[in-house]
């Protein structure tokens, strides 16, 4: 612990952002990260606690507290404070293959469990993580390091999202010959097309993927396994296969008029916009435009927020975000104590931009769509929305959100984006490999393991645990890699945490 009194001497300081009305003019990353001096002050605030919940990744009250990757936060904070940036990078990279991603898109579970934040403000862990990895790139610490010995074993990974990339990175370090198959035209999966460029600049992904290529990992893009290439062909070429295909089956909305023109799933909307941005700087017209339209987003999560920010940048006339659940409290409730994940109101970048542009928060709580209304040409023109309330189901004993009779209202809308979450993996991949699915339509395995019912076929990421965070996908990829390595070699020294 470099400075025992640091948490008393320095206040919390975190990355700033470009002003909302300025940043909506483009799709560039808008965070202004801390200087090294401020990063070192934040590192000095780290208390090196007796029980550092920041790195615990424990499940408390059904939710994760601390980092699922068990990042050695107190250790590398101390190294940052003392100016030993290379060693800080080594400690960070020991548990996290992709800090350049998590330092930009992770909700910072570590900070919510920080002891310093129990009575005061937490350490700016995510900003320091960003500082460590960017310093590593600037000084050559994050250079390619190909394995010195190859095992002769071959592994195919289906999907290049965070779990697939993590598994590939780990297995390649072990010396196995790894090939990653990606159906899209670029590597990255969710990172590339599911997260907008202003949140994660795609050059950051390309930078890391290029290093992985130099380290010997092979990438096959534009190949949809299960359609373009059959599993039987992969079985002949590879000793093991890991399915990292994500949970891309979107949850739909059942309401009259659902077939109206102008209703899209959020993931398709975001994907098309990013593709057009990267291919032509949005000049090819191959995207759904919100320009001049009243936009309604169904869903209050991160994807819904990304849609808010994207629609505003496209020039939407208005943006409304519907959330089924009640508005969370601004502070922790008595039954939600630290170090549990705080169930409190969060105003994200998209909502901040809506407030700046339209003068009000775009969210309407305890509300859903009752009916979509079309014009004579079948185009969406407005919605009927209805308020919801929590009621106990007498049969099950569970509380459910149900419509409030007589609360219907009309809302103008020419574009609706459904961001209601995902139901599980796409069925054609599972059918092609013959893997079993569980009740949640995720690929089934024994608890705590990654082997499927099909010999030599493993699974990791969202198509295993369900829709989740990037940090969880990385952890799944690392754990699956270790299990695959052990099955190939009889033992494994790949670290998981």
Identify what each model region corresponds to.
Residues 5-32, 41-44, 57, 70-82, ...:
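Beta1-alpha1 glycine-rich phosphate/pyrophosphate-binding loop at the start
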Residues 12-34, 42-45, 365, 373, ...:
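C-terminal catalytic lobe of FAD-dependent flavoproteins
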Residues 40-56, 62-147, 213, 221, ...:
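Glycine/serine-rich phosphate-binding loop and adjoining beta1-alpha1 elements at the start
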Residues 87, 149, 154-158, 206-255, ...:
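Feature captures the FAD/FMN-dependent oxidoreductase FAD-binding
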Residues 151-154, 222, 291-294, 366, ...:
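Phosphate-coordination loops involved in phosphoryl transfer and adenosine-cofactor binding
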Residues 159-162, 299-301, 462:
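Glycine-rich Rossmann-fold phosphate-binding loop(s) that bind the pyrophosphate
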Residues 259-292, 392-467:
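FAD-site-proximal beta/loop scaffold in flavoenzymes
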